[in-house]
Amino acid sequence: MPDKGLFDIHCHIVPSVDDGASSAEEAYKMLQMEYRQGVRNIIATPHYRLQMFETPLETVEHQFLILKQLAQKVAPDLHIYLGCEFHSNMEMVEMLRNGEVHTMAGSRYVLTEFSGSTKASYIRERLYSLLSHGFKPIVAHIERYECLRKDIGFVEELADL
């Protein structure tokens, strides 16, 4: 990955696959805004959540190719990578191992999120499961989880993983 410019590693910009960019036109405008703000590298992270955001992988990948073409129209030094914001579930590791969802730019990093009321024990178990299978979790929206807002010690534990 190039090391020039800012990185946006959590962006719902792939058109027509989740609650982010609703069209290629909107995605193009978002790319222009990102570029004007100094962003040169974007990891597009469409949602994956059972029974809510289950866009077929082929559709996500097709729309991502459209996004890459749009990025080149904005500027040749705007680099786009595919990732995923994965709402944690018990099948997560298996889905990642089977390539049913994307890691962050093909790395071992996984952007994962939880419901706001998720218990600390479940968050801990899911993160340790990822780690024990060679994945490196990035917890999205840390401010949303009640158990983390109430327990700074748990936040520190997660930071030390």
Explain the meaning of each model-derived region.
Residues 1-77, 156:
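An N-terminally biased module of ancient metal coordination in phosphate/nucleic-acid-related enzymes
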Residues 54-161:
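Extended substrate/RNA-proximal surfaces in nucleic-acid metabolism proteins
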